[in-house]
Amino acid sequence: MNTLHILFAKFRRRALTLAKGIGALLLSSVLLAGGCQQNPSIDQATGAQDAESTPALVTVSPRKSPNDTREYRYLTLPNQLKVLLVSDPETDKSAAALAVYRGSFHEPDSRPGLAHFLEHMLFIGTETYPAVDSFQQYITANGGSSNAYTALDHTNYFFDIKNSALAEGLDRFGHFFIDPLLSPEYVEREKNAVHSEYQMQIKDDGWRGYMVSKQALNPEHPGHRFTIGSLDTLQGNVKADLDRWFAQNYSADQMGLVVLSNASLDDLQALVEPLFNQVPNYNIGPDYPTVPAYTDAQLPAMITSQTQKNAVRLSIAFPVPSTLPYYRTKPEQYISNMLGHEGEGSLHSLLIQRGWIESLGAGTQSFDRNTSLISANFELTQAGSNHVPEIMGLFFAHIDMLKSVEPEAWRYTEQAKVAELAFQFQERGSTVGFVYQMAPRLNEYPPEDLLAAPYLMEGFKPDLIKDLLARMTPENVLVELAMPDFQSPTVEPWFAVPFALTQGPVPVAMPDNPPLNLPAANPFLPENLSLLEPDDAPIDLAVDQPGLQLWLDTDVSFTTPRANIAIELAVPGGLISLRDASMARLFTRLVNDELTQSTYPALLAGLGYNL
């Protein structure tokens, strides 16, 4: 079974908010799932509600971009299952995702990987559709695909399919959560499938780094555990544990469904409501870890580990109180945007000039409902690997510079403008990508903000910014350094990664008067976003002279205020040798590096280039 683990939503250059993935996702293909069995018995005394006796709640229309032509409707079914319906008459595929707000955090200590194992078992069959693997066969036969992943705090199931087959596809999908068979005769097969995924990841540097990072967590926190599962962790009478865990954790009040199709909202509601209202509701309520992820006993700390690939990575992370309650104002984004800036006078620019890094990115991620991580990731050069204390010193000097000045409203306003532009003119991805990203969001934000939440910056809160900065100190830091030539007699127990954990002061060489400056105002932020008048004239050859031709065309059909400019430089004689091609490639990389400082503000404003 193929597995994708999003470990470090990798810090990409020029990104506004990215994340270090200690709260990673385990994404597993369902192509090998199979089997059938009786639905586990559920004790009705646990509080299952009669869905017919509870009226549906009032529907809500989430606020959306003015350029978004889709229609949205949020509703809560009588059984308390949250639903977001999306009508897109232009889509050629329908898609659906259901997130269960229970994941690896909620497993018993004795059964690491049980949530992931249940994810596999649900695809085997249901009482209504008992044929083994029939769901996947139906989806594939109708031009679609399906998948699922198990995260720390939720499990997410999703599929896409041609529009005409949505009704039956959704019915088959819904019965995963109504009458799954969880067949005992397929337990061994799926245990082996889970174990195979575990074995596949043992040499993966993302997984290796993720597992090593757990060594610095509070051992009482559920995030400290192994999560994939293996033959060892799933041995014995796992079927009884599986049935019990399903009955205790898969309840309608802790589920969120997103359905996108070309049908109208009324038609989608008529399809979804009678089906998913059958999912039992046991009113189990939310369940989040209460144990702190890190205590004074864990931090400060530095973990050094071995990589398989020839790459050196440095991560510097600060646990802070969860920033999720402040999603409308995002004080953490003010900080990460400053730390990750790549313009003149930035930390990125200085470290590039010294030849110590290949890239730098900064961002924030929620680890659990109590803790967020503000972090920076560096990809180091070979020279940089010999200057880690100096790099850390410059990083803390940059933080000290931010602390030395009051947070500035004009900077926040500028960042809010960038976020507003990103929301207003966002480009659509795949339908299935949209639904599986939205399903967990139904548990994080109020209905009216489901679409806008990641982009909102609606109030400058300098005190919140200063409070976060005050927590970004060498005494409250987790440093992770991964390099290929590191050796240690201590190995991580599940992935056998050589590592060393040092708890106590981290190596920081503070510089004297480093040449660091805060970013200047961005001159590229647009003021006028009105579209040009439609022009049916043919493409115009505006300039035609020796060595230069310029063609112009006006196209407002995409209703976005963007211009695409393509410039082709003709090389006399062409690239006729391997050396010519190599030199041209090297030239473009050098030019791109040279332009980074001057073009970064333009990139933040939505202007991009590719050489």
Task: List each language-model region with its residue ranges.
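C-terminal motif of bacterial Sec signal peptides marking the signal peptidase cleavage site
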Residues: 32-35
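Bacterial signal peptide processing site
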Residues: 37-39
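Scaffold signal of the M16-like zinc-metallopeptidase fold and its non-catalytic homologs
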Residues: 54-55, 125-126, 169-172, 176-178, ...
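An aromatic/glycine/proline-enriched structural segment found at the starts
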Residues: 56-58, 219, 224, 256-312, ...
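Mature N-terminal segment immediately following signal peptide/propeptide cleavage
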Residues: 65-97
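M16/MPP (pitrilysin/insulinase) zinc-metallopeptidase core fold and M16-derived inactive scaffolds
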Residues: 95-160, 203, 207, 224-230, ...
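M16/insulysin-pitrilysin zinc metalloprotease superfamily fold
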Residues: 124-128, 160-191, 370-427, 572, ...
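Acidic/histidine-enriched alpha-helical segments
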Residues: 181-199, 264, 283-297, 364, ...
